[in-house]
Amino acid sequence: MCSIETPHFVIQNGRVQPRFPGGISNELADHIAAELVPLGLVRDISAFERIFVDTVLAARPDPMQAWTAFYGNTMRRLRRPERGGTGAVATFARIYAHALSLVRGATVLDVGCCFGFLPLLAAEQDPRLRVIGTDLVPATAALASRISRVHGGRARFAAADLLALPVADEAVDTVLAVHVLEHLPAGASTRALAQLRRVARYRVVIAVPLEESPDPVFGHLQAFDLPRLAGVGGFPPTPGWSRAVCAADGGWLVLDRGAPDALPDRVGTRCPN
């Protein structure tokens, strides 16, 4: 009987058994990548998602209790991230904080929101905001909706395709797409950006990881550096829009619809406020 032990998993006869006595949060993604990928147990996003979900569900006998605990652990760490931390939760806490600092207006749409941590944080931190999160996977959007109701129901969630958003033109003040574009084929970036600009009244905020090559384990289909991200934003910028590109825990593309206080068109290392 072959058995391999890592800090958070026991692999026996090809079966992965998790061990997280301190509780499971979204740091699980780091542990899968660091401990199981080198063993050849996770070769693509399908295997990653299967192990991720199975690990979360193994923590409690009731599935909803398991997901509620997962959300609770993650949200607590996002609210009080480890200073200077490099793990998934600490890194995304900084990314989410920066994204929220760029919000203009009173309505926010977060596309490709996955578990919906960013919309939940936005609704929690600013009661004045009307926040909607969308994800391509209906089950993920439904799970986020159930968790939102536990948190007062201020953030709303729906299933939607980024390439065909069921949202009227200029219907929301700020549109966020945080770590979404890298999951699209390169040829779809222009279509995605057209949808984001269409529904945004004031601003579009896009964040991507900066990579030399796409990481298939996380489902990445294209890789970005700052020049390529700037190219997605258009050069020269789309008429009526200004553009800023910068780096801060990844790459950022901020597009403002033409206005007296719109961002100047620029590409650099310092991110706008």
List each model region and its residues.
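Hydrophobic adenine-recognition pocket in adenosine-nucleotide-binding enzymes
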Residues: V180
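S-adenosyl-L-methionine-dependent methyltransferase catalytic module, highlighting the catalytic core
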Residues: M1-A29, L163, L184-N273
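Conserved N-terminal segment of class I S-adenosyl-L-methionine
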Residues: M1-A164, T190-L193, Q222, L226-G231
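Conserved acidic residues
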Residues: A106, D173, Y202
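A conserved beta-strand element that flanks and buttresses the S-adenosyl-L-methionine
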Residues: L176
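Short amphipathic alpha-helix with an adjacent loop that forms part of the alpha/beta core around
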Residues: L165-E170
